[in-house]
């Protein structure tokens, strides 16, 4: 059979069947001309690795797929049974007739962005159910003579902690568990440089991400005899799933993109793809948001909130977001011990309800938003008292609470209907609500669903994610004009699967500016700034001018009490908002250029990044001084996108004063000398606005 080649921009993956019909992978992504690759030479297909190795097919290749058949069979020998292509959609069918099993390897190419999506769909026609134990979304092999892996592990308030190291011989694993907040343990994103560490502008590098809202396992495997071959197995976990005849099981999707010239061009491709194919309304500007949580926690009433609205409007914000604590009648939400599940406004705190609050926001020139946690319930609630069987629990075990709450069982259709109906009713009762923050603050600990029979309890981990996604689909469909923020104790759901129903994600509950700068830097390899919500807070008593400057390089907002601001702090916050509104189109829709990375050798505590508009005629550059620097040594910030034939007007601003330094420079001198670095003091910032229009 002729080889199958599926292109994604400058890159491609190719397959061919061997003489036994087993599908082999011939190549995965390009190498520079003249570089060796494992598929060079006049070799037969048998010399190449299996494209999707199954259990019992080849013991030397760890399986991407494993099942136990209805009759107890475990060996699987799938052979090529067909190939279909329609536009950019490709389907390669593998079949094992003895098992009455089909495995469709599905690929979707995005040539304009150079992105490839890959997943598998499994079905069978046996006499009864089978158990799928492992089903990878993808298991490609690539030529990687000197592979270096960048991974992003985490914890609460420590998401996106990056580490880069060579991939040793053996198996390296990135994994997370759970079905609610898996990204608190490890991010499903990674970078793999194939020929030593990649730079921003040099070196072949692959980016990958499993688009899944539950636990995942990414394995990077090198063998002693063929260390230049690297197999990446990408899948969800726990993966055990009881599958009935004629039912199609689809794995999560794996997202790939490739750059031969470093991480910068890779980032641009992913950002354009995320805006165009993942997040909602990817070409729309996001508002400046004022959130109440760190200003009030549970201590507020209507009068206090209205005073805060006046202060929020004075800072120049556009959206007022009321966080946790607004609901509960019989069990009012005065702390985290009661009220979850009873989504009616607390009449003691909000006698006019949500409509009165929305009207107050509108009078202050603000739109109004609301926090919800619809997947959770407190035992101290009307909902739990009425439906104690609606929670995820294993019979015979105590129901352990986290944050005094339990997880609703979304596998029950009536629970899904409750979640969708709750959000719909809130929006119907207060038509002025324009924004929802969807949160989730605990994991599943006693996995059990009353909706699943005893022999299907293992399906809970997968079915919970799919049920949640169905609820999110319904909510997004019934509220197309409502902006949605994705949150899960911070960045517990920062995945490309769940983001499809949301406009932005809360990256972390950690809002220390220096820590957030590093988190935002690492996340920026994959997510555009408009998707990363960043708020100015008083975390650790930090300097607010510096905190503003860090938040301005993402989707800018505040989470503090305006009444607590000193005159100098208020001036800095107002100036930050004004500057952000001027450059917001660049930050949210422009091309990101990472210039000086955090903690780079020789950086002397400097960090810098910029955003460019069309043809690089307009740009904004943010410079940060994380640690004190000696003023005796000159330093600069590179401007690699400058056009040597243009002349730029440059405005240099800080948030601690109301003036600006204005100069003019030709592009040639900017390319050669960069921008003079003015900062020496710890936790200070500078903003440059460049305009050649």
Put a short name on every predicted segment.
Residues 662-693:
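C-terminal beta-strand-rich structural cap/linker in extracellular carbohydrate-active enzymes
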Residues 10, 190-192, 200, 600-644, ...:
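Carbohydrate-binding surface patches
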Residues 78, 241-260, 683-690:
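Short Pro-Gly-centered flexible turn/kink motifs
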Residues 120-122, 297, 328, 346, ...:
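Active-site and adjacent substrate-binding regions of carbohydrate-active enzymes
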Residues 2-6, 11-17, 23-223, 237, ...:
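Polysaccharide-binding surfaces and accessory modules of carbohydrate-active proteins
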Residues 281-421, 430-431, 435:
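Aromatic-lined carbohydrate-binding/catalytic grooves of carbohydrate-active enzymes
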Residues 46-76, 202-219, 256-279, 317-324, ...:
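Glycine-rich, aromatic-flanked loop segments that form ligand/cofactor-binding clefts
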Residues 378, 384-417, 462-563:
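Glycan-recognition surfaces
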């Amino acid at each position: 059979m002729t080889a199958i080649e599926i292109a994604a921009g400058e890159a491609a993956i190719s397959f061919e069947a061997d003489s036994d019909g087993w599908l082999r992978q011939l190549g995965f992504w390009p190498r520079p001309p003249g570089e060796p690759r494992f598929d060079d030479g006049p070799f037969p297909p048998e010399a190449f690795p299996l494209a999707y190795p199954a259990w019992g097919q080849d013991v030397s290749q760890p399986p991407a797929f494993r099942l136990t058949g209805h009759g107890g069979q475990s060996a699987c020998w799938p052979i090529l049974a067909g190939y279909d292509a329609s536009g950019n959609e490709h389907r390669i069918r593998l079949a094992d007739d003895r098992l009455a099993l089909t495995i469709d390897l599905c690929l979707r190419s995005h040539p304009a962005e150079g992105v490839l999506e890959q997943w598998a769909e499994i079905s069978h026609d046996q006499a009864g159910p089978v158990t799928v134990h492992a089903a990878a979304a993808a298991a490609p092999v690539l030529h990687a003579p000197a592979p270096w892996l960048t991974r992003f592990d985490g914890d609460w308030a420590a998401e996106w902690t990056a580490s880069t190291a060579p991939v040793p011989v053996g198996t390296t694993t990135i994994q997370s568990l759970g079905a609610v907040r898996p990204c608190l343990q490890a991010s499903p994103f990674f970078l793999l440089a194939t020929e030593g560490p990649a730079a921003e502008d040099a070196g072949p590098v692959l980016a990958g991400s499993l688009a899944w809202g539950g636990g995942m396992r990414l394995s990077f495997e090198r063998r002693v005899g063929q260390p230049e071959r690297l197999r990446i197995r990408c899948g969800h976990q726990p993966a055990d799933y009881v599958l009935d005849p004629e039912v199609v099981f689809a794995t999560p999707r794996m997202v790939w993109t490739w750059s031969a010239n470093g991480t910068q061009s890779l980032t641009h491709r992913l950002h354009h793809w995320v805006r165009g194919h993942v997040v909602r309304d990817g070409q729309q500007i996001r508002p400046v948001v004022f959130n109440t949580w760190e200003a009030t926690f549970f201590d507020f009433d209507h009068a206090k909130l209205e005073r805060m609205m006046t202060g929020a409007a004075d800072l120049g914000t556009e959206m007022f977001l009321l966080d946790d604590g607004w609901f509960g009648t019989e069990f009012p939400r005065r702390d985290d011990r009661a009220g979850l599940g009873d989504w009616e406004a607390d009449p003691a705190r909000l006698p006019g309800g949500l409509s009165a609050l929305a009207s107050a926001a509108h009078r202050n020139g603000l739109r109004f938003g609301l926090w919800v946690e619809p997947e959770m319930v407190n035992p101290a609630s009307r909902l739990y008292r009425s439906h104690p069987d609606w929670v995820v629990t294993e019979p015979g075990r105590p129901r352990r609470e986290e944050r005094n709450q339990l997880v609703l069982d979304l596998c029950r259709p009536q629970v899904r209907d409750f979640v969708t109906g709750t959000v719909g009713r809130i929006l119907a009762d207060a038509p002025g609500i324009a924004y929802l923050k969807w949160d989730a603050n605990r994991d599943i600990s006693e996995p059990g669903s009353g909706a699943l029979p005893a022999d299907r309890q293992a399906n809970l981990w997968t079915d919970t994610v799919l049920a949640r996604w169905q609820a999110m689909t319904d909510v997004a469909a019934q509220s197309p004009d409502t902006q949605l923020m994705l949150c899960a104790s911070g960045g517990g759901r920062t995945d490309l699967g769940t983001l499809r129903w949301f406009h932005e994600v809360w990256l972390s509950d950690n809002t220390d500016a220096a820590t957030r700068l590093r988190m935002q830097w690492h996340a920026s390899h994959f997510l555009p700034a408009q998707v990363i919500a960043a708020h100015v807070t008083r975390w650790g008593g930090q300097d607010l001018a510096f905190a503003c400057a860090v938040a301005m390089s993402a989707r800018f907002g505040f989470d503090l009490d305006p009444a607590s601001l000193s005159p100098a702090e208020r001036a800095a916050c107002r100036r930050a908002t004004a500057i952000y509104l001027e450059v917001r189109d660049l930050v949210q829709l422009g091309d990101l250029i990472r210039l000086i990375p955090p903690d780079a050798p020789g950086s002397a505590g400097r960090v810098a990044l910029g955003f460019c508009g069309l043809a690089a005629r307009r740009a904004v550059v943010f410079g940060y001084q994380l640690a004190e620097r000696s003023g005796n040594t000159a330093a600069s910030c590179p401007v690699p996108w400058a056009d040597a034939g243009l002349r730029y007007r440059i405005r240099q601003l800080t948030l601690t004063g109301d003036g600006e330094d204005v100069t003019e420079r030709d592009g040639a001198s900017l390319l050669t000398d960069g921008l003079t670095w003015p900062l020496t003091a710890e936790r200070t910032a500078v903003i440059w606005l460049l305009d050649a229009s």
